[in-house]
Regions:
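A short helix-loop-beta-strand connector motif used in the catalytic cores of GNAT acetyltransferases and
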Residues: 43-56
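N-terminal start-of-chain detector that recognizes signal peptides
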Residues: 25-30, 42-43, 128-133
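Residue-level marker of structural boundaries
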Residues: 23, 32-33, 45, 138
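Acyl-donor (CoA/ACP) binding surface of acyl/acetyltransferases
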Residues: 1-12, 16-22, 54-162
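Conserved, charge-rich beta-strand/loop surface module that forms ligand/interface-binding patches
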Residues: 27, 37, 42-45, 68, ...
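An amphipathic alpha-helix signature
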Residues: 8-15, 33-41
Length: 162
């Protein structure tokens, strides 16, 4: 597995993810083109400014993109936390890519002392995401509603102390 910095070459991957009903069912449905463009620009700006980390997940060197991994700060209740997100397209799911990408991003965050803890908010309806959080050593916290690009998501809050 390889993580590459997100670039304009990955815009098609964002469109693939955000327009796939299987991937977006829990997130308010597929995004219209203008919203996809806004997300693409946000991911690129986060990468270029280093405010957040956005990586393209590839199964191997030179392979087509299989998904995205993010680590960025977000407001949460009365605080700012660091959130980890991994999205792998259906054709590449169940191959361990999300787990491997998450481990790599967490290891880098730990090495660079980017944060003291990492949070994840997988949809309650995703037992695979919950199993991944548990396998990575995250502690299960509370159920909550989170905002995902303007859509309300019923999620489970997980946290990993680095």
């Amino acid at each position: 597995m390889r993580l590459d910095d997100f670039s304009t070459h990955d815009f098609a991957l964002v469109e693939t993810i955000l327009s796939d009903p299987r991937m977006m069912d829990d997130f308010g449905g597929v995004f219209p083109p203008e919203k996809i463009e806004k997300v693409q620009r946000h991911y690129l700006a986060s990468t270029e400014s280093e405010e957040g980390w956005v990586f393209t997940i590839r199964p191997s060197e030179g392979a087509e993109a299989a998904g995205l991994a993010f680590l960025w700060d977000r407001p949460w209740r009365d605080d700012v936390i660091t959130e980890l997100v991994c999205q792998v397209v259906p054709e590449y799911q169940r191959r361990g890519l999300a787990a491997e990408a998450a481990r790599s991003v967490i290891a880098r965050a730990r090495l660079e002392r980017r944060c003291k803890s990492v949070h994840a908010f997988p949809p309650e309806s995703s037992p695979a995401a919950a199993a991944l959080c548990a396998a990575l050593g995250f502690a299960k916290l509370d159920r909550c509603d989170v905002d995902f690009a303007g859509a309300r998501l019923r999620a489970r809050h997980w946290c990993l102390t680095l």
